[in-house]
Curated annotation (Swiss-Prot):
Primary localization: endoplasmic reticulum
Zinc finger (Phorbol-ester/DAG-type): 840-891
Chain's gene name: PDZD8
Protein name in the entry: PDZ domain-containing protein 8
Membrane topology: Single-pass membrane protein
Organism, scientific name: Homo sapiens
């Protein structure tokens, strides 16, 4: 009995201990993820590049140090730093293992149908090219392949050697302290030279059709080939490989030909010689064929089918979910025609329903033209004939400032579609329809994407700008440009297309030289951060705050005293466009492409009462409402659709439209019609052909819905020639289904991909300098030349949190906010004190020597005697002086003094005022006074060689230093020694290309005096003056084109000399290079003077045409003076090219005036 009890007690105790052990082992401790996933959760995804081992590193980089220059001597021992006991490989290696491997593959593949088709295809291509040659084409009419035999063996590689030096890829890591350690990166290019011999007996039989209707038979056998072959694998500028003979190989052909059963040696010699020429022309260095397969088959153009089936799991699309995208690195970017430039780049991501290329490049707009009782609306039209035989279309050639057309925001280059519902086919029809219309007429027009013209907007809002702005961030002489930037940021209309910024830049130069870029960075726009909610500063931050359940900042209450400016176009009333938040943050470039991004419309919002004189982005600007949660956004979709459909019907008066729009801005709406989501990364430094993002600032989280189909990725850099402009470096569109399938391939739902960037539109010129030699090779495709970007994708599981991204965004944003908010109040208070005491013009009588216009009424000063402000060079008639002081009393010189004082108060290393980047000051100073001079390339690369320099930021910020004031003898509007504001040349005129930047130049010590430039320009005004205007323009533009080419070539030569001078260590060679550089600089300086010389002729034509226009406007000005007094300070003067009463039925010339 006791034994049974003991057994029972033991069983019970054992069961209890087992359960207790199970509890402690299985339930007490939380399940741990695998080691690699735990590391990723703590540190984020880490991208590791493949690296060579120590022995391979020694083979690639170590042996070349002791190798003789001729390459014949064997390499020395290994370096002490890496495997000293292992001897370096010999210079030449035997490849018996490779020969055996190739022979085995040849035996298995020789008789397959796939190999036979590939060989016959290649032979037929050679036949086609042979028939196109002059010699063979005269005798041969056709070649057909009768038989082909690949031979008994393959080429035998006797020896092979690595061509040194081997250049390693950039890693972004600093070099070793002494530079002795071998690089740990893979090589950028591998080149091998092999001695090859072939005796395999490859032969083919050909049937030849001669020109006489006869046929012949040709048998060609490749008996022997001996030569040195170079095999190259390279990543520059894109990944490819090629092989080619180093020198002419020794080739023996065995040829037999028959014609009617008789030998024909003439045909035999032609074929043999042609085959040898083909090998020399195509397969002997420096000629070769760029190849991708079989090693790099991914280097092919990707395409998207129009009708694609979508994958669904039950009722859910495969792509729906939360996708985390992490940027890792970008490489091989083509920046301004070079692969070696350093630049700050950033990336934008967008979820969309369409691909980048599928977006339309123009938009249809509707505007209400208020003609009133005026005879002219200020338009000059041109009929463009269609190339397909149909009727042509009418485009706007010029728009007169302050005219009804300018107020309605019609711009040069707009294509008129219909007026009052009647389709437009001729310029005469436009004249009649507008003449017969009443006070108001509806105009339907098409505007190319990227076109911008802020002139009319500037004039329309000039009064309000003078009353509400105290531009403390402007430099001397830069008041109009800075105001243009601010107003353009408010008044521009970004179409629904996925815009290409490179296209924006070129389109603006094509239509108007001074048009600001559509994608001005908020860094370059004056902004008061202290009065904006976080949602208005960054949509990304706002989204993260909403996700994290943070309270949204309250909306700023508005003041009743401010009135919104009048609105013109009906499409602005779209609430989806009204409530679109400003893209990007106040510290980073915007998020182009910007889908459905419309103008943030003015409202009655204003800054605090305590800051009456503070510089704001625009006092009337609406504060964009913060983004709401997903459910609220979906509820707003139906409202957006209804308002979008009703938008074309809303043609109201200015006050009514403004009132409606202001009321609509309070409605929370979706930021785009197709539920697009955009994100932008932080800027990174791209150098040594590589740019890396930090893990803490390169991740974003997208909520993918069923309407999203593509992830559009674009890389951008700043445009050095346009303030606030951005240039697209490349883009790529990914199917979200491919991304989802790639993530689902592994259980951790993530994968890594390196994506080749597509060319921006319009493409950068890749054949000019960096790729001039490569573009001449067969197989070259410039679409491969724009670099690549490496991205990590991860689909988050349901319920899986990713606090890493939110934390990163907050870390990225908040320090800037704290810094700016803490800095601004002191400076704003100081600005207000200075602005109250110094804001009046100080006019004095001035006699002008050149054609001058009144800055107030915009009329010409015919007597050349007027009043000019002593501080800001503002010019006005003596009769306009009292009106000017009463209405526009703000003097621009006050802004310059304030800005100069604030610069001195600013701490060293601190961000410049109002979010402007440090180099904006230097860029802003470029537009102080427009001067003719350097072309784009000279400005960018060789200003030091010309003994000219841009006004630097340090010079601007020196105490007591002021910019060069305009001479009292000249007005800012005159064309003397300045770039003309009116362009009469074609859109691609060299005069525009060479003078679009308006750089302010200052003479260096020892450089040319300013009088030299003035003298050269004055002499150039008389060039070809005796010729007709059109012929004169053609001759001048021809010379400018020629000079541009010469400058480009000289710049390329100069850059090569600079690189050689940096690389060489020989003192004698360095002195020779210095002398060559000096001569190159002198040549560049001479070419620059010639460019100024011929550009002056273009300006002379512009001046003459403007004078003739003013003389005509003077004749009719007396009829319009009474009308001008009734326009509420929005139209100062109407410049008419031709009154309607003088237009006859035969006005079908090149241009018509309306």
């Amino acid at each position: 009995m006791g034994l049974l009890l003991m057994i029972l007690a033991s069983a019970v105790l054992g069961s209890f201990l087992t359960l207790l052990a199970q509890f402690f082992l299985l339930y007490r401790r939380q399940p741990e993820p695998p080691a690699d996933e735990a590391a990723r959760a703590g540190e984020g995804f880490r991208y590791i590049k493949p690296v060579p081992g120590l022995l391979l590193r020694e083979y690639l980089y170590g042996g070349g140090r002791d190798e003789e220059p001729s390459g014949a001597a064997p390499e020395g021992g290994a370096t002490p730093t890496a495997a000293p006991e292992t001897p370096a490989p010999p210079t030449r290696e035997t490849c018996y293992f490779l020969n055996a491997t190739i022979l085995f593959l040849f035996r298995e593949l020789r008789d397959t149908a796939l190999t036979r088709r590939w060989v016959t295809k290649k032979i037929k291509v050679e036949f086609e090219e042979l028939l196109q040659t002059k010699t063979a084409g005269r005798l041969l009419e056709g070649l057909s392949l009768r038989d082909v035999f690949l031979g008994e063996t393959v080429p035998f590689i006797k020896t092979i050697r690595l061509v040194r030096p081997v250049v390693p890829s950039a890693t972004g890591e600093p070099d070793g302290p002494e530079g002795e350690a071998l690089p740990a990166a893979c090589p950028e290019e591998l080149a091998f030279e092999a001695e090859v011999e072939y005796n395999g007996g490859f032969h083919l039989a050909i049937d030849v059709d001669l020109v006489f209707g006869k046929s012949a038979y040709l048998f060609v056998k490749l008996s022997r080939v001996v030569g040195r072959l170079r095999l190259v694998f390279t990543r520059v500028p894109f990944t490819h490989w090629f092989f080619s003979f180093v020198e002419d190989p020794l080739i023996d052909f065995e040829v037999r030909s028959q014609f009617e059963g008789r030998p024909m040696p003439q045909l035999t010699s032609i074929i043999v010689n042609q085959l040898k020429k083909i090998i020399k022309r195509k397969h002997t260095l420096p000629n070769y064929k760029i190849r991708f397969k079989p090693f790099f088959p991914y280097q092919t153009l990707q395409g998207f089918e129009e009708d694609e089936e979508h994958i669904h799991i039950q009722q859910w699309a495969l792509t729906e979910g939360r996708l985390k995208v992490t940027l890792l690195e970008c490489s091989r970017l083509l920046i301004f025609g070079s692969y070696d430039r350093e630049a700050n780049v950033h990336c934008t991501l967008e979820l969309s329903s369409s691909v980048w290329e599928e977006k339309q490049r123009s938009s249809i707009k509707t505007v209400e033209l208020i003609k009133g009782n005026l005879q002219s609306v200020g338009l000059t039209l041109r009929l463009v004939q269609s190339t397909d035989g149909y009727a042509g279309h009418v485009i706007i050639e010029t728009v007169a400032p302050n005219s009804p057309a300018a107020i309605a925001d019609l711009q040069r280059g707009d294509r008129l579609i219909a007026i009052g519902g009647v389709k437009i086919t001729s310029t005469l029809q436009v004249l009649k329809l507008i003449k017969q219309a009443g006070d108001r007429v509806l105009v339907y027009y098409e505007r190319p994407v990227g076109q911008s013209n802020q002139g009319a907007v500037l004039q329309d809002n000039f009064g309000q700008l003078e009353e509400n702005f105290l531009s403390s961030s402007c430099q001397s002489g830069y008041e109009e440009e800075a105001a243009g930037l601010t107003v353009d940021t408010e008044s521009r209309e970004l179409d629904s297309e996925f815009e290409d910024l490179a296209s924006d830049v070129r389109a603006q130069n094509e239509f108007k030289d001074e048009a600001q870029s559509l994608s001005h960075s908020p860094k370059r726009v004056p902004t008061t951060l202290s009065i904006k909610p976080l949602g208005a500063i960054s949509p990304v931050l706002n989204r993260k705050l909403a996700v994290g359940s943070h309270p949204l900042p309250p909306k700023i209450q508005s003041k009743d005293g401010n009135k919104p400016p009048p609105l013109k176009t009906s499409e602005i009333t779209d609430p989806a466009q009204v409530s679109k938040p400003t893209q990007g943050s106040a510290f980073k470039p915007p998020v182009p492409p910007r889908p459905q991004a419309k103008v943030p419309l003015p409202s009655a919002d204003a800054p605090n009462q305590a800051e009456p004189d503070v510089l704001v982005e625009k006092p009337e600007k609406v504060v964009p409402p913060p983004l709401v949660d997903k459910s609220a956004e979906k509820q707003a979709k139906n409202v957006d659709a209804i308002d979008d459909a009703a938008a074309p019907k809303q043609f109201l008066a200015k006050q009514e439209v403004a009132k409606d729009v202001t009321s609509e801005t309070s409605c929370p709406t979706k930021d785009s019609s197709d539920d697009r989501q955009t994100w932008e990364s932080s800027e990174i430094l791209y150098r040594n052909k590589l740019g890396k993002w930090t893990r803490t600032r390169a991740s974003c989280l997208f909520d993918i819905e069923a309407c999203h189909r593509y992830l559009n990725i674009a890389l951008w850099c700043r445009d050095p020639f346009k303030l606030g402009g951005l240039i697209c470096l490349g883009h790529v569109s990914l199917k979200l289904e491919d991304v989802a399938l790639g993530c689902l391939a592994t259980s951790n739902t993530e994968y890594l991909s390196k994506l080749r960037l597509e060319a921006p539109s319009p493409k950068a010129i890749v054949t000019r300098t960096a790729l001039r030699n490569l573009s001449m090779q067969k197989g070259f495709n410039d679409k491969f030349c724009y670099g690549d970007i490496t991205i990590h994708f991860k689909y988050l599981k349901e319920g899986e949190s990713d606090h890493h991204v939110v934390t990163n965004v907050e870390k990225e944003k908040e320090p800037h906010l704290v810094e700016e908010v803490s800095v601004l109040p002191k400076e704003e208070q100081f600005v207000g004190q200075m602005g109250l005491t110094e804001n009046k013009h100080s006019f004095q009588d001035t006699q002008f020597q050149n054609p001058t216009w009144c800055d107030y009424c915009k009329k010409k000063v015919w007597t050349k005697a007027a009043s000019q402000c002593m501080f800001c060079a503002y010019v006005c008639h003596k009769k306009c002086q009292e009106k000017c002081l009463a209405e526009t009393s703000v003097c621009g010189a006050t802004d310059r003094r304030i800005d100069r004082t604030l610069k001195n108060l600013r701490l060293e290393g601190q961000e410049t005022l109002l979010g402007l980047p440090p180099r904006v000051d230097a860029e802003a100073s470029k537009s102080v006074n427009k001067t003719t001079g350097l072309t784009r390339h000279i400005i960018n690369t060789s200003s030091r060689l010309l003994n000219l320099r841009q006004v630097s930021k340090t010079r601007l910020s020196e105490p007591g230093t002021d910019l060069v004031e305009p001479s009292p003898k000249h007005t800012p509007n005159t064309s003397d020694n300045e770039g003309s504001d009116t362009e009469v040349c074609g859109p691609n005129s060299p005069s525009k290309r060479g003078n679009s930047t308006g750089i302010k130049l200052v003479r260096k010590e020892g450089g040319l005096d300013d009088s030299v430039f003035i003298a050269v320009k004055e002499i150039g005004r008389d060039l070809y003056r005796g010729l007709p205007t059109e012929e004169r323009i053609q001759k001048l533009e021809f010379m400018l084109d020629k000079l541009q080419n010469e400058i480009d070539q000289e710049l390329e030569h100069n850059n090569s000399l600079v690189r050689e001078e940096k690389e060489t260590t020989d003192t004698r060679k360095k002195s020779l290079l210095s002398a060559a550089l000096a001569k190159s600089g002198e040549r560049l300086q001479a070419l620059t003077l010639l460019m100024i010389h011929y550009r002056a002729g273009i300006e002379d034509i512009e001046t003459l045409e403007s004078l003739s226009l003013d003389q005509h406007s003077k004749k009719i000005s007396k009829y319009t003076d009474d009308t001008e007094e009734d326009l509420d300070n929005e139209i100062s003067q109407l410049i008419d090219s031709q009154p309607f009463s003088s237009i006859s039925d035969d006005l079908f010339g090149p241009s018509e005036s309306v």
